[in-house]
Amino acid sequence: MFGWIHESFRQLVTRKYGKDIWEKIVHMSKFELGTESEIAHYYNDDETLRLVNSMANVIGIPIEEIWEAYGGFLIQFTMETGWDELLRAMAPDLEGFLDSLDSLHYFIDHVVYKTKLRGPSFRCDVQADGTLLLHYYSKRSGLYPIVKGVVREVARRIYDTEVVMKVQERKQEHLDAFVTEHVVFVITQIENANSTQPKSISSKADSQIDLSTGIYEISSSDFSLAFPYHICFDPDLFVEHFGNFIKKTFPNAMRQETRVTDLLELVHPEVPFSYESIKYYKNSLFVFRLKGLGDIVHNANDEAKTVLLKGSMVFIDEGKYILYMCSVNVTTVRELIERNLHLSDMQRHDGTRDVIMLNQSRMSQVELNRTLEETTKKLKKMAQELEIEKQKTDELLCELMPASVADSLRSGKAMDAKEFADCTLLFTDIVTFTNICAMCTPYDVVTLLNDLYLRFDRLVGLHDAYKVETIGDAYMIVGGVPERCENHAERVLNISIGMLMESKLVLSPITHKPIKIRLGVHCGPVVAGVVGIKMPRYCLFGDTVNVANKMESNGIQCKIHVSETGKLNGLKANPSYVFIDRGNTEIRGKGMMYTYFLERNDRKSVWELCSRPRSGEQTIDGYMELHDQSIYQEEGGQQENLTVENGNSAQNNHNNNNNTHHSGRKLMNGSSVDPGSHHIRSPTCTIS
């Protein structure tokens, strides 16, 4: 169906029920929003029926009521959009209006929009009691309720009267190869209390004025000259006489020997060409195609264009003959050329001449509007695509730096470096990562890191910290930057417990056992700011970064190594933390430092910190599973004797062989740690 119908539906629903209801209807009918009501687009019937069925389901009213309401709104919307004067000028009464609907449909289809509408046909009969019988024919079954809404609204708005419509008969008729629905309505006028002068629905009962003043004879040759396209024929369809154009086109046509069907092929209305059909549709517009007349063919690829005649049937001599008064059905100069016709072929009083010349300017405007609509559609699509790309850019920018910093950069504000007096840093890496890289394919390494880092990222978001960056197997987060907070140490320590637990779920591609990680935590001041223009990064600088990195590199696998300041800040925020005293550890560049291992958080279980459900066979708090070493392969080497800090001095029997200094350690492919910042220089690619 024509896109105007879909646009009318959209206007009806949005005005009465709101935009949200229409969007639900569009979604249910499986249209992409914005493509469901393109005026210049032709939708197939299945798409329109799908839209109407969705309206009935969402709004909750029967489909017949949907069609009837649409019929009434269609007249309202049509009059609002520039067709008001045309509709009011069509006829002096409702009967004449209904008889003119066929020609109006044909005009809209073939002149205004040039679409392939399969519109209905109408004919009206006046009954002796003043009621009207409206015959409605349509190749689309079930749409007759539209007629009820249309007729009632036309009577109310144009003729200031109220009518009642009832279906008298509904049947299926076979016309040629089509099955046509034929519905007969009885239209009765009722009194309108709000109208002072209601108009009659029919003027056929008015008195006839005698205009006879004598007989003025005109010869057949003069008549053929005055009306070059006319054809007169009898009820048996034998030609009686015809105009000069027809005679020139068909020189072998003979009076009372040639049938009209030998010369013309009925195009509109779509009914069998017979005397009975002409009688039924006498008030309709008739369009014929001249048979066997294919005119100018400009090149081998052009299709032959036939001439169409458009006019009306007039019964003369008390119905003994039918006079088809018509003119050539062309509306543009291009159509004239394609049919080898000229303006001079038409009578000077023929309004078709004016239509052709006016259409030259109108068509350029219609084409401009169509181009504008298509351009607007493309611009909307481009705007949507641009918005999607903008969101992707924003997401990428937020991956490179905190959201607050990214917002400032997008707004064009200068971002100066800021000093943070206290924050908590965490570093983690994978034990024997170099060996894993040497023995596995790059794909396995990337899969391993992706699995691990997705788990870490979830924990960072869960506890509201910030991931600074990942390089290779090194993962760095910070609490208290860029948003200052009092419990930054608690957040990071909780994340470290979750990281250690989550790492047990990631398997090494070599041993197929859980990987082992080291974690280091330290608190202190840092300076943070955006570095770079083309590839901006949010970086942290200061000795705190170096010490936090040393906590990780001097730690022990599957342990959370915490500095003195890290422990103090953690207990200040949450006294329920339990630390194991490691004792003095020599840190390159810092000398001896007293450090600790984080054992547990008595306030929260591991399952709470990881935001994972506990299975029935697992312990309530999960710390036995957190420190379970049996899941790893047995390894040699003396273990540290660790004492839980309980107010007494702890004996540190730490084996110096396990206290190897890792500051400035070599990474894969010869890369090394820069002891002055968190940046790890590596010739390998960065995996984020």
Curated annotation (Swiss-Prot):
Residues 358-401 form a coiled coil. This is Soluble guanylate cyclase gcy-35. It comes from Caenorhabditis elegans. PANTHER family: GUANYLATE CYCLASE SOLUBLE SUBUNIT BETA-2, SOLUBLE GUANYLATE CYCLASE GCY-32-RELATED. InterPro entries: A/G_cyclase, A/G_cyclase_CS, H-NOX_domain_sf, Heme_NO-bd, HNOB_dom_associated, HNOB_dom_associated_sf, NO_sig/Golgi_transp_ligand-bd, Nucleotide_cyclase. Residues 424-552 form the Guanylate cyclase domain. One of its GO terms (molecular function) is carbon monoxide binding. The keyword Cytoplasm applies. Its EC number is 4.6.1.2. Its cofactor is heme. The gene is gcy-35. Binds 1 or 2 heme groups per heterodimer. Plays a central role in social feeding behavior and oxygen sensation by synthesizing 3',5'-cyclic guanosine monophosphate (cGMP) from GTP. Oxygen, which binds to its heme-binding sites, probably regulates social behavior by modulating its activity. cGMP is a common second messenger in sensory transduction and is implicated in oxygen sensation. Indeed, C.elegans exhibits a strong behavioral preference for 5-12% oxygen, avoiding higher and lower oxygen levels; a higher level of oxygen inducing a naturally polymorphic social feeding behavior. Expressed in URX, AQR and PQR neurons. Also expressed in ALN, SDQ and BDU neurons, and variably in AVM, PLM and PLN neurons, pharyngeal and body wall muscles, and the excretory cell. Mg(2+) binds at D429, D473.
